A protein has these predicted regions:
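Alpha/beta-hydrolase active-site loop
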Residues: 17-37, 53, 57
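Conserved alpha/beta-hydrolase
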Residues: 2-16
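Short beta-to-alpha linker loops that shape the active-site pocket of alpha/beta-hydrolase fold enzymes
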Residues: 10-14, 82, 204
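C-terminal catalytic histidine-bearing segment of alpha/beta-hydrolase fold enzymes
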Residues: 154-163, 179-234
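Acidic catalytic loop of the alpha/beta-hydrolase fold
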Residues: 161-166, 170-174
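Mobile cap/lid helix-loop segments that gate and shape the active-site cleft of serine hydrolases
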Residues: 91-147
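Primarily recognizes the serine-hydrolase "nucleophile elbow" in alpha/beta-hydrolase
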Residues: 35, 41-99
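Phosphate/oxyanion-binding active-site loops and adjacent basic polyanion-contact surfaces
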Residues: 17-25, 50, 176-180, 217-222
Length: 234
């Protein structure tokens, strides 16, 4: 109806550096272009959480050097994606120390082990590795890799739901993805990206089973997102 082809690649956790994920996406893009004769300049990519992380790093690598990727995304979107791996590591340490939510503790232990293995240590041990691989780095004046999004249309949805976080995870604003998301979008706007947008929602996070959770697809307004995509594809 809108003359848009939607592709849902099945991406499971591969590497924190997203090397294998990006290789897989390159194959997907190549097949789609060959099968449907879609111009390489007409792709918009994005996703929830990890899917958004993979998409934003793909766009950054494409903008850094077009030889890095098969396509250069025309725009990118994300829903409540973590951006700064150093921040995420530190937040995971706090979740383990609090020992309040079993789900949060288990995920945090998994993440710390993974980062220590792939990066060669903690952010204190190898800070440059974290800057090198993060979508955004709060420690860097230019935002680290975020500088490669300075000319790319980007929209990120996030729902802080601070009361829910305090009650269900004992987390505060320092622990949430919204801090880095707002910081990165603000930086991009300051650097002249007039198409960098932040959407903060309230009470929209609902899982398919009806459970309230702010880290959910439902915080994205599908109709507005479709209109945004159509506008960027012009």
């Amino acid at each position: 109806e809108k003359d848009i082809l939607v592709v849902f690649p099945s991406l499971n956790w591969g590497t924190t550096k997203f090397i294998e994920e990006h290789k897989f996406l390159d194959k997907v893009f190549k097949n789609v272009i060959q099968q449907y004769q879609i111009p390489q300049t007409k792709f918009i990519i994005g996703g929830l959480s990890g899917g958004g992380m993979v998409s934003m790093r793909y766009a950054e690598r494409a903008n850094e050097n077009i030889k890095n990727t098969y396509i250069k995304p025309k725009a990118v979107f994300a829903i409540d994606s973590p951006l700064d791996f150093s921040h995420l590591y530190q937040q995971s340490e706090r979740d383990i120390e609090r020992n309040f939510s079993e789900a949060a503790v288990n995920e945090s232990k998994w993440l710390i082990d993974r980062y220590n293995s792939e990066f060669g240590g903690s952010p204190k041990d190898v800070p440059l590795e974290y800057v090198k691989n993060s979508i955004y780095s709060q420690s860097e004046k230019d935002g680290g890799n975020a500088k490669f999004l300075s000319k790319t249309p980007i929209i990120i949805y996030t729902e802080p739901a601070i009361q829910w976080q305090m009650k269900n995870r004992q987390r505060d604003l320092y622990d949430l993805n919204c801090t880095d998301i707002s910081a990165m979008i603000n930086l991009l706007q300051i650097r002249g990206n007039k198409e960098a947008e932040l959407v903060v929602t309230h009470n929209k996070g609902i899982r398919p089973n009806g459970t309230k959770h702010p880290h959910s697809w439902s915080i994205m307004d599908s109709d507005k997102m479709l209109n945004w995509i159509l506008e960027k594809l012009k």
